[in-house]
């Protein structure tokens, strides 16, 4: 039987509250939850320095078990910047095995890299061998950084969060 893998956003203390965001997408905002619309929780442009969204802790979860296993989880962007020089999305480029409470200060979860350079030619591996229902991968942690040079108004451009895995 084919597996069903969903993308979970993990919020609250130790990133323990999980919400399936496969259909609604990953939202980077000023509150730590999976349901508030981004327009209701914007990131304010700082007068100086940098403002941060809450970290968004993500992991893959198996809801229908595969015949054997799902492995080789990878994530990547299309390489499109939100506002070059004014805002960027960062992502961990190495394993994050344990959840912590998301913060809205600079993330220390794993080695941070600019998500825009993590394209199809430079995908980020996410560890996990999922064999049964409720198995989960390790974490992917993304965060929006907004600099004082950002322009006023709503950012209407989105950045695709792509992922793949092998089922065998």
Label every PLM stretch briefly:
Residues 1-168:
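Long, small/polar-residue-biased beta-strand-and-loop interaction regions
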